[in-house]
């Protein structure tokens, strides 16, 4: 419609309510660009990609991020300057693709090792390892894990932290979920709700 509208300004037969001419557009061979993919990917190197390719396309061609690669801060360098830090979690968790911009000739994609990996187990919907940013908290981790299951104890979680010499154990209350920050190697456990009643009353004898 855009092309038809623009061409109709020059060729009268294309526009109007009853046009007597048509536009047929065929896309031929697309231009290719050279992009360098470095760091923690399966197959780092220089790749020839379509000029319509984005960072996600390039990572796919390189075999994806390896076991120690970061998904939270993938750098796109253009003309010696970092122009984007791509957070794959924004796409996986929220469906946002704002950072997945189109690549240009000579772009460099750098995948650094992750900084913080935390495991959450127990009564959450997606128990597994998650990469966390330095400012993220227990609340962020619970969001990534899909939230509590129906039989979980939601008032507190247990956290085991490896300090380098010994293990530290924390009981984090619900009110602190949004402020308690996580460290690399933390283990968070969400227990099941206790098999008891909070407000149980027992009545015995002759009751009328």
Cite the ranges covered by each PLM segment:
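Ser/Thr/Pro/Gly-biased, low-complexity, turn-/loop-rich segments
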Residues: 1-208
